[in-house]
């Protein structure tokens, strides 16, 4: 999953250390072209909590799921929007009959969502979806930014017996 901005065209800061920049850089220019076409057809910026899909191109993945997470403000709406991102991606993966999905730690970088809170939301959404709605997904991977993020996810996953 690519955590992206509302333009969905990749990070516009050269050399920026965000997941959006990394994915667009390594996947290739075709991703930006595809996303530009999708966004031109849509005619407006992408709101939080939805998902668009492109080919993975040069990445070792068939598809890239692009979603806009919330910029953290401390409001309850942030949590709802973050959950919507995860549920939208899970539903789309299931609809596409994919058996696995990889999530980054959405909104916890430059968007400022506290990792403790964000990881609980991510794990709760995945756990709920797999138990209640899932038809095809067999593997979910959380790809995190740092060792401390890893420890936070690991600790919080124990609450769900993972």
Segment roles from a protein language model:
Residues 2-162:
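Macrodomain-like recognition of ADP-ribose-binding/processing modules
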